[in-house]
Amino acid sequence: MSWLLGYMDPTEPSFVAAVITIVFNPLFWNVVARWEQRTRKLSRAFGSPHLACYSLGICILLLNILRSHCFTQAMMSQPKMEGLDNHTTYFLGLAFLGWGFVFVLSSFYALGFTGTFLGDYFGILKESRVTTFPFSVLDNPMYWGSTANYLGWALMHASPTGLLLTVLVAIVYVVALLYEEPFTAEIYRQKATRLHKRS
């Protein structure tokens, strides 16, 4: 990892902005979602849990667009690595990008808008946890697909800065999952218990 640092200036403003957006985004949506789950204040403010969830989802989408922009600007402002600047690496990056898009888009299709954007924190639950593709082949495919997108983008640009930022994306997602996965498992366990009692 240390060899990457020789190709970048960590004080460069666009790099700092990329780091901030990468760390902030999952922190923001987890804090807001937990707050909503405890207080239901967003649902009351917007008049319904669905409208509140849609509003948070739009905020998350806009933040993710900003994160991707900052990521790209950080790569463009730092030098390329000659050893990565070749056709093989470019097409490898393209493959990762394609793989990432497949997992992100298929996850969105399987979960729907509210399932993707934390609807369970708003009390909007599916009949059961989704286990169809891509969840049948990979846990948390939305997060790992997103990480693959950033990795592919970094490789296509022969960017050591992009590779380092991709590692940060992966670390932040792993930390987020430490909070998200137990919650999701628990709410569906509670739902199954309630349904069992009714039957």
Swiss-Prot record:
Q: What happens when the gene is disrupted?
A: Severe liver pathology rapidly occurs in knockout mice after 3-days withdrawal of dietary choline, which might occur during starvation, pregnancy or lactation, and may die after 4-5 days. Homocysteine plasma content in knockouts is 50 percent less of the content in wild type mice.
Kindly state which keywords UniProt assigns to this record, in alphabetical order. Endoplasmic reticulum, Lipid biosynthesis, Lipid metabolism, Membrane, Methyltransferase, Mitochondrion, Phospholipid biosynthesis, Phospholipid metabolism, S-adenosyl-L-methionine, Transferase, Transmembrane, Transmembrane helix
Q: What is its EC number?
A: 2.1.1.17, 2.1.1.71
Keyword Transferase (UniProt)? yes
* Pfam hit, one: PEMT
Q: Name one GO biological process term.
A: blastocyst hatching
Q: Which molecular function terms from Gene Ontology are attached? A: phosphatidyl-N-methylethanolamine N-methyltransferase activity; phosphatidylethanolamine N-methyltransferase activity; S-adenosylmethionine-dependent methyltransferase activity
Recorded GO CC terms: cytosol; endoplasmic reticulum membrane; mitochondrial envelope; mitochondrial membrane; mitochondrion
- Keyword Transit peptide among UniProt keywords: no
In which residues is S-adenosyl-L-methionine bound? G98, W99, G100, E180, E181
Catalytic activity reported: a 1,2-diacyl-sn-glycero-3-phospho-N-methylethanolamine + S-adenosyl-L-methionine = a 1,2-diacyl-sn-glycero-3-phospho-N,N-dimethylethanolamine + S-adenosyl-L-homocysteine + H(+); a 1,2-diacyl-sn-glycero-3-phospho-N,N-dimethylethanolamine + S-adenosyl-L-methionine = a 1,2-diacyl-sn-glycero-3-phosphocholine + S-adenosyl-L-homocysteine + H(+); a 1,2-diacyl-sn-glycero-3-phosphoethanolamine + S-adenosyl-L-methionine = a 1,2-diacyl-sn-glycero-3-phospho-N-methylethanolamine + S-adenosyl-L-homocysteine + H(+); 1,2-di-(9Z-octadecenoyl)-sn-glycero-3-phosphoethanolamine + S-adenosyl-L-methionine = 1,2-di-(9Z-octadecenoyl)-sn-glycero-3-phospho-N-methylethanolamine + S-adenosyl-L-homocysteine + H(+)
**What are the intramembrane segments of this chain?**
13-33
User: Which PROSITE patterns does the UniProt entry name for this protein?
Assistant: SAM_PEMT_PEM2
Membrane topology term? Multi-pass membrane protein
- Topology: which residues are Cytoplasmic? 67-93, 179-199
Q: In which pathway does it act?
A: Phospholipid metabolism; phosphatidylcholine biosynthesis
Membrane-traversing stretches: 46-66, 94-114, 158-178
- Which residues point to the Lumenal side? 1-12, 34-45, 115-157
Kindly state the tissue distribution recorded for this protein. Answer: Expressed in liver (at protein level).
**Which top-level enzyme class is recorded in the Swiss-Prot or TrEMBL entry?**
transferase
Q: Which family does it belong to?
A: Belongs to the class VI-like SAM-binding methyltransferase superfamily. PEMT/PEM2 methyltransferase family.
The task this protein performs is described as:
Catalyzes the three sequential steps of the methylation pathway for the biosynthesis of phosphatidylcholine, a critical and essential component for membrane structure.
User: Under what name is this protein listed?
Assistant: Phosphatidylethanolamine N-methyltransferase
Provide the species name: Mus musculus
